[in-house]
């Protein structure tokens, strides 16, 4: 019998696998609006290997059975999705982001380990406009362990990364050919860890996991690109940064963020 894991972490990762294609669809719909004959593609990130460094007090996730990035062609009239192949990766590309032109895709490789510190990685891909297939451009360190979220800065010259197990966020420059450069900035979260159970959330909710250490879980720029926000679910805090678009630096804002009720 399948065991239901009510942790917030497990729920969110399942949701990402099911709904994580929406940024791609939005970008590619804009890019392909002038060419109705071009394929409309959806890409789904998966867990393709177990999380080796999960602490016993942290979430209990089963080994992933995905095979990397799964590709689907979307029927423009009905929305039906037809399998169109897969880009095999054993590093759990669990979160994906595609640029507005639909020509580049970036993946957070959550279970990759690229050096002795256990740092994860992020990969850049070129998207073939004829058939939507992916070609790996390069892979670089993510600035911390367990990269779980990636998003593009509105100007398109930087990729923002949240590293769940490292409790850090990073800024990676996007080079002219779409490849990723080394991080221009890395910030490590610090502070008092919240309680295991939520203060206000009712029993059975998803708000009772991730309070064993810092866990950066999401990072996003505002539409103007002047500010970047990221959340740490271990600290129950939203960080606010001013963004230096010339150097790719995160500068503490005043105020530097907001703390939320513990566990909520």
Regions found by a protein language model. Give the residues of each.
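Residue-level detector of Asp-centered blade-edge/turn motifs that repeat once per structural unit
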Residues: 37, 100-101, 154-155, 223-224
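Short glycine/acidic-enriched loop and turn motifs that connect beta-strands
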Residues: 49-52, 111-115, 166-167, 235-236
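Short loop/turn segments immediately following beta-strands, especially the blade-tip
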Residues: 73-78, 126-132, 173-181, 242-249
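A short beta-strand motif characteristic of beta-propeller blades
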Residues: 82-87, 136-140, 205-208, 254-259
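Asp-box/WD-like beta-propeller blade repeats and closely related beta-sheet repeat scaffolds
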Residues: 133-217
């Amino acid at each position: 019998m399948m065991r239901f894991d009510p942790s917030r972490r497990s729920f969110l990762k399942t949701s990402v696998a099911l709904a994580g294609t929406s940024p791609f669809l939005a970008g590619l719909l804009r890019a392909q609006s002038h060419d109705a004959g071009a394929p409309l593609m959806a890409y789904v990130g998966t867990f393709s290997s177990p999380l080796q460094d999960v602490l016993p007090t942290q979430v209990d996730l089963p080994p992933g059975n995905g095979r990397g990035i799964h590709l689907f062609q979307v029927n423009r009239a009905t929305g039906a999705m037809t399998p169109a192949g897969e880009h095999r990766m054993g590093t759990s590309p669990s979160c994906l982001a595609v640029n507005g032109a639909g020509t580049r895709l970036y993946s957070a490789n959550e279970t990759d380990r690229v050096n002795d510190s256990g740092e994860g990685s992020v990969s850049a891909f070129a998207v073939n406009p004829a058939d939507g297939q992916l070609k790996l451009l390069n892979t670089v360190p993510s600035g911390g362990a367990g990269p779980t979220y990636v998003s593009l800065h509105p100007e398109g010259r930087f990729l923002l990364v949240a590293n769940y197990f490292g409790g850090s966020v990073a800024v990676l420059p996007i080079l002219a050919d779409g490849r990723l450069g080394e991080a221009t900035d890395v910030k490590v979260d610090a502070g008092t860890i919240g309680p295991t159970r939520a203060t206000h959330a009712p029993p059975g909710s998803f708000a009772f996991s991730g309070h064993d250490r810092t866990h950066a879980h999401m990072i996003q720029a505002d539409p103007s690109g002047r500010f970047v926000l990221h959340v740490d679910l271990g600290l129950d805090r939203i960080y606010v940064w001013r963004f230096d678009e010339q150097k790719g630096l995160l500068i503490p804002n005043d105020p530097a963020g907001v703390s939320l009720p513990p566990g909520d």
